[in-house]
Amino acid sequence: MSRFAQIFDEVLQEIIPTQQEIQAIDNIVEELKQHLKVRAIELGIKYTSMEPQGSTGIKQTQLRDDFDVDFFIGLDITQFEEKFKELSKSKLKQESKQYFLHLCNEWIIRSLKNTKFQEPSLFYAEHPYVRAIYVSDGNEVHVDIVMYLDLDLEYIKERGPITSVDRSPWHGLFIRDNLTVNQKNDVRLLKQFFKACHCYGDKSALGRMGFIGYSAELLIYYYKSLESLFLDFNNLPNNYLDFYKRSKNQLRKIMHMREDPLIIIDPIDKNRNVASAISLRAYKYCNHMISQFIQDPKVEYFQISPLKELNIDESHPLHAKAFIIELVNNNADVHYTINRDKLYSLAESIKSLGEKEVSHEKRFGSIVFELYFEDSTQEYNLAFYCEQPLISKTFLRKGPPIKDKRHVERFKEKNPDFVKKAKHLWVETTRDYTEFLKFLDDLVNEKLPDNFSLINIAQSSKSKTTSAKKALFVLIHMVLPFLDHPAQ
């Protein structure tokens, strides 16, 4: 028995779903099928399959208390192609959205009217789907009903999917058929570990996206066991996990994979890197925690605890360099991923404009940010580290090379107080901003998305909400220690 086995076994006792939970999901699925079949017959709708996908479906890699159901309905691609046979693949994709929208409204939502599936509503990812709530034994089960085009595996491998969810049933079959029961338990342990690190899914506290379920499943598939993965996790960026056995150079020649920090190729689609969206920050923090676990294995590394709050006072070494933006979302209908992406765009703009003047000279120096949000309270926070929050009123702006006579004369006319330095002309220029906090305030008020209200922009010591204090903890204790920048 390995030195980790006892820990793994102890954790598994707490996270493997109970038979009662599994049976409850099975009952919900059967009830859903019956409602959908009745309406399908009425409308003359033909489908190829109806079954649950994801971890609670055919994969069976879910954690205890994971009651969400991803229910997939396959549509016959031959009928679909006959209807839209003259369209290109991109046009076919667009038309499929309209067709799926029609089926969501006329088939799925109407099927669930006056049933135990409450509040069936339209949601949108790449194309429309329906979400409903089913209460079972006091637990709210979110049921997502998703349609896809039932494509042959060879079609996907040769031409790719028409919509991204067309791969999903094949993902389920691959995991079902290629992981043993013990390996599926290793997947559960890995998911639990990522969640304990707050680095799982699209609500990851670090980066825009953490590790996802399918990436965890494939990591166990490629490494064979959780122990093997943990012992080599530090080398993951250098290990190109490719079902198709291509070399590093071959993979890096694929344009959309050139900059991806991690490579985990989808066995179903050779052109898809499952790890493309996983934040390097999430990897680095998980790598640190795995290293700690290897040195001193404890059950506590798998226990999910709330993020800590960081109360910063003037004695803290980063007191003057850490800042917080506290926001509240006023429109609960806007999905958190949309809000996340909007605020990432705002923060990237702050970073870009804050690090350099318009003329590219250094401004406030290195800027690092992290977004932390709590969907349940609609609170969103951007925490910033700024290398030089107070800077001089003027700076030397670089002009043309001295040898460029035509541009030199024009520069001299506009800037009679020029100086010569390092083979260029320079001129002392007044800055628009000398205080990072003022710069932050103006830019946020100019660019903040309309659905947000501003609660607070301040130095870190003046944060107000508990979620803001958590954002500061994430930035200072989970992000900055693992980045190469002046704070270290």
What would you call each of these model-derived segments?
Residues 61-63, 71-76, 131-137, 144-181:
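Hydrophobic, small-residue-rich alpha-helical packing segments that form membrane-like cores
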Residues 1-64, 73-99, 148-151, 170-171, ...:
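N-terminal regions immediately upstream of nucleotidyltransferase
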Residues 36, 42, 86-158, 357-382:
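Conserved catalytic core of two-metal-ion nucleotidyltransferases
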Residues 18, 22, 94, 179-180, ...:
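Hydrophobic alpha-helical scaffolding
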Residues 370-488:
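Extended, charged low-complexity segments
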Residues 182-348, 352-369:
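Conserved nucleotidyltransferase catalytic core and NTase-mimicking acidic/glycine-rich helix/loop elements
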Residues 69-79, 327-334, 381-386:
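Short, hydrophobic beta-strand segments
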